[in-house]
Amino acid sequence: MSFDINWDKLVSDDSISNSIKDFLNDQFNEISLPSFVDTLSVTGFSLGSIPPNITIRHIGNPFDEFYKRNVPEEEAKKGQLPVSPELSGSDSDSSEEEPAINNLDSTNQQDFTPLLPEVDSLRRQNQESKHFNNFNMNNVGLGHMDLDTPTNFFNPHAYRLHSNSVGRNESVKKNDNDIQFILEIDYKGDVALEIVVNLLVNYPSAHFITLPIKLKITDLVIHSLAAVAYLENSVFISFLCDLNDADSDYFTSASMHRRSDAHSRGSHIPPSSGGNITDYVPSNNKERIDVIRSVKIDTEIGEMENNVLRNVGKVEKFLVEQLRNIIRDETAWPSWICLDFNDDDDDDDDDDDQPSTASTQHSSHTS
């Protein structure tokens, strides 16, 4: 089953792009910068004109974790829908900072206890998806699966939550209208992210040269399985695992060899007009999910010496690694993004005819 997305409406809403830009800028500002970078800021973001291809693989009930909320007392008094990092077992709390788009770390990765799903029926149900990764789930405590599909993701009761949270726990009441879609997202679009950094040359002395450079990250490639759940007038989004392309096997030795070669040489294109364009694909690993499969970076620089160009390459690699880490840590299971469409003032009848704006909820994520 497939459906069309009115991508133009998303692109035309500048507030969405600005929210994503501000969120990424906040995340990058929390990163410890290497010695060859002074400052880093996200200056622009565009969703582009090409929408993702989305295929519905399963429709069912939302994961139980989406109903488990830890309620700080101050948020409970305000009547807000709470999101707290305590479910992840973390003592840190950065909920005072409110970037526009944030994740909820649903639980400690080691707190998952797998329940045996009805494997045979699920295998028959999803036999059309034979190109899914035969991935290793040990990094989230689910054990290795020898099936062609991540069948546990299609079982709404496949995980039992053991919460070691501190504070008052609340469970959102289940409703007959609650629904969850397991989606295959295949995106090869023209999303663009612009970043400005100050490149430092620390020879012959520290901060000997400070060179501002502008980097544009484009050609984002994502092919993943994601859960999108709707409950209590909120939308939960979480990436579950990366998927194979239909014509290749991500974990075969030949495929890994090609990816390793591409990663080592970076698919460089000769610089033109002081710029540098580099393709970046993920390094050879068998992690459950990267989300971002590959990106391209266009760097605007002047005519510089080779040692400066080498530092530019380090900056590019650093940015790609950090961007991939941010997206994975903030949106990949057991973390998720929650878009809250509940109005703050339910008794405000004057705004009934106005479209509801999505607000997002914040919690810290401990890697």
From Swiss-Prot:
Region Disordered, as annotated, extends over 74-112, 261-282, 343-367
InterPro entries xref list: Mdm12 (IPR027532), MMM1_dom (IPR019411), SMP_LBD (IPR031468)
Q: Which UniProt keywords apply?
A: Endoplasmic reticulum, Lipid transport, Lipid-binding, Membrane, Mitochondrion, Mitochondrion outer membrane, Transport
Database matches in Pfam families: MMM1 (PF10296)
Functional description taken from the UniProt entry: Component of the ERMES/MDM complex, which serves as a molecular tether to connect the endoplasmic reticulum (ER) and mitochondria. Components of this complex are involved in the control of mitochondrial shape and protein biogenesis, and function in nonvesicular lipid trafficking between the ER and mitochondria. MDM12 is required for the interaction of the ER-resident membrane protein MMM1 and the outer mitochondrial membrane-resident beta-barrel protein MDM10.
Of which family is this protein a member?
A: Belongs to the MDM12 family.
Kindly provide the name given to this protein in its UniProt entry: Mitochondrial distribution and morphology protein 12
Gene name of this polypeptide: MDM12
